[in-house]
């Protein structure tokens, strides 16, 4: 099976942790570097969570770079502790990794990796797009160096989750999102339309908790916190699968059922629709005819049920740490 070099940009909360573990377990992904950005938590906390998860997974060799603390305009809003816990990973305490941060910013790391792997590097962005925008400013030819970028963010027809119309990753830095989505590269946008309709249930969490692997068990514990938040949205203990679904699409392990390539704009005004992704879906009634110049594939629906694939992949985790005891991986 062909493996592609990946750069992951994340704001490591609970679903980011799931996405990271999924990438590490996927034979299609060769993670060469990870950048942290403020979103669910601050960039510094997200970087620490990422380092600790990599240590637990036996992948401490993967470099982690600190990225932007604040969005391009304004300042960091403080994260989402009511969703992810104060520490971003559901109050689960992981042993602190010995590895430190890479001696470069996340934007510099992305540019370097793109130059080292021209035409083959895949980018998966599952947080606000500040680091990606800064990389574009640093290297304007970045879109020609990157094979494709997959972004978890936006809401096409679905309601928002930060405001009535805006999804959190986009709304936390609309200016960055506008810059990234207007760049001349192949984008796959994974919005709330598909991530909110693919749900992880309590029986899936119990499978992770029953695993002999350190990583699946830690993820199962984190999901307890996540499920309690989503119970207020779904009426039962479960959760949406935002970031791991984007990861699976990025590696090509799942197939979109509806994914038109359309023009997408981001509202950067100061009004009530700030952060909204305006997707041109007017071709809906003609099976989405081609839109000249459009480069953004918007995934609206998925073939099959994603949850069993996610759990199976995580349970089959083959890292050296998977069968070890999760020292410190307990709920605080």
Predicted regions and their residues:
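Conformational coupling and interaction surfaces
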Residues: 2-3, 22-23, 30, 171, ...
């Amino acid at each position: 099976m062909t493996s592609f070099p990946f750069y992951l940009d994340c704001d490591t909360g609970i679903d980011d942790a799931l996405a990271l573990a999924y990438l590490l377990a996927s034979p299609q992904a060769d993670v060469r570097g990870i950048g942290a950005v403020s979103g669910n938590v601050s960039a510094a906390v997200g970087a620490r969570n990422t380092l600790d998860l990599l240590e637990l997974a036996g992948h401490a060799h993967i470099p982690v770079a600190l990225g932007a603390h604040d969005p391009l305009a304004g300042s960091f809003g403080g994260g989402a502790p009511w969703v992810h816990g104060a520490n971003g990973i559901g109050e689960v305490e992981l042993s602190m990794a010995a590895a430190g941060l890479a001696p470069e910013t996340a934007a510099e790391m992305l540019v370097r990796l793109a130059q080292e792997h021209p035409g083959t590097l895949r980018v998966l962005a599952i947080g606000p797009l500040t680091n990606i925008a800064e990389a574009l400013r640093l290297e304007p030819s970045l879109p020609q160096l990157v094979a494709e970028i997959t972004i978890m963010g936006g809401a096409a027809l679905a309601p928002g989750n930060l405001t009535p119309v805006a999804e959190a990753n986009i709304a936390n830095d609309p200016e960055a999102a506008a810059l990234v989505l207007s760049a001349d590269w192949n984008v796959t946008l994974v919005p709330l339309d598909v991530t909110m309709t693919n749900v992880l249930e309590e029986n899936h969490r119990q499978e992770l908790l029953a695993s002999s692997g350190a990583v699946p068990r830690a993820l199962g514990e984190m999901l307890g916190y996540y499920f309690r938040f989503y119970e207020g949205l779904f009426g039962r203990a479960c959760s949406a699968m935002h970031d791991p679904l984007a990861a699976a699409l990025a590696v090509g392990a799942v197939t979109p059922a509806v994914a038109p390539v359309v023009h997408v704009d981001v509202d950067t005004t100061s009004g009530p629709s700030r952060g909204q992704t305006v997707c041109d879906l007017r071709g809906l009634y003609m099976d989405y005819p081609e839109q000249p110049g459009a480069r953004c594939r918007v995934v609206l629906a998925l073939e099959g049920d994603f949850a069993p694939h996610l759990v199976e992949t995580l349970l089959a985790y083959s890292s050296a740490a998977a069968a070890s005891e999760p020292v410190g991986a307990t709920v605080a």
